[in-house]
């Protein structure tokens, strides 16, 4: 230590410290900047004053507010002042236990600039600090930055700059062209050059980084602070560039490159560091509350497959003394409940009107004065949708059913409440009636004509579904009657073992349970139309389906998987 002219000890020169050393306890958040951060000295204030300067008369408001070192700005960066600020360096600080505790308790950086941050905390906590930079595009990052060491992360950002520097025309930043790094070919993916080469505004605050077009205020990207995993800028070999890796819904995980005028990159990366420190302090003051998972989530197997007998654990209103039943009574699971606003509209039309509920096809169902829908009988009917199977998402051969239902919903027109009680889901009589009615009006037919419903053609005959009976299935050794999913899986020992059971949650729905590649599979055997079928073949009955695949040694193919039937799991006598 040497005494200065004013009796004050002059600081000892130290080697530059990378920004990553400031975050020893946050491995997923690292910054790289070998020079020191700009302090709040007079020189540094003049450099960064563009973000805090008051608008002068005659100077465009945009340049005064966003003030940065884009060549079109009114005042360029004072390079001598920037050099003095860089030369001043950051006062060294040893990592002692007290300083480490300071980071944990208050969220302060260990190697914080001696003169403080570049901007007031209130500015970063509030509207943020804006800079005018040139956006160079982004490159997809295929691997998580947490899985890479710090040197590899730095190489990723430099390789991204190296690729975009050649692809984007009109770049002015200082960059030495390097040979492509083949070792990073598996980490970096495709590039996105949309908005590349445009002058944009980057706003930095505790909320994150917001990239927008200054003239039109169009948002290019908005990266929250917690989505940014790495930032680097202002190094000796990338003095004019800032690179950061963040995730967003458009580009997924990508490395975004910003080109700054000379000296501005250090200001940008310093402001990002300040925003991160303030955000971390906010986290320390109000950490998120621990969420206790429900007991049902304790077992992954239970979550994945569900429990058919879970309904027995619920407390129903008719088993609790004094408990009133819910309003509305039983609601058929085939009916889609309308929005409350729809019922309010009906109520406004007349106080004496009966609520009408419509199913997925838009057909009316009279609920009656009590609002109770007719309960389903639990079996699949010929011309109506069967009750919703709550295990449907757990089966491997039901992926195409939702698409068929959506098609039918989109194509089926709306019927009126006074429609004849014919085939409800046959739309052709309704269409024919509309055509006949239009012709009648055009021809001037009077009310003496026969009733309209008598002129409707009869619905076409449709093949009745094959509904297997309990007596027929009881004759087969592989049929076990009503059985839960878990109980059926316990009976399977080897690949090819199979049985057929009646669903517990949806009586009348028959399920084939078998073992394939050590995993149990569950296939629905009767489709919503009541037909026994596989993906490509229709069968006369469940027994026909089982015998066909068992005798011919053919697998049942469903949802890109197959199930072989080799060993019959016989039911207990």
Curated annotation (Swiss-Prot):
Residues annotated as domain SH2: 478-569
Chain residue ranges for the region called CH1: 310-477
Biological function: Signaling adapter that couples activated growth factor receptors to signaling pathway in neurons. Involved in the signal transduction pathways of neurotrophin-activated Trk receptors in cortical neurons.
Modified residues (Phosphotyrosine): 316-317, 395
Primary gene name: Shc2
Description of how the protein assembles with itself and partners: Interacts with the Trk receptors in a phosphotyrosine-dependent manner and MEGF12. Once activated, binds to GRB2.
Occurrences of domain PID (ranges): 125-309
Post-translational modification: Phosphorylated on tyrosine by the Trk receptors.
InterPro entries assigned to the protein according to its UniProt record, in alphabetical order: CEP152/SHC-Transforming, PH-like_dom_sf, PID_Shc-like, PTB/PI_dom, SH2, SH2_dom_sf, SHC_SH2
Gene3D superfamilies given in the database record: Pleckstrin-homology domain (PH domain)/Phosphotyrosine-binding domain (PTB), SH2 domain
Domain notes: The PID domain mediates binding to the TrkA receptor.
Protein name in the entry: SHC-transforming protein 2
Protein species of origin: Mus musculus
Known tissue expression: Expressed in brain. Expressed at high level in the hypothalamus and at low level in the caudate nucleus.
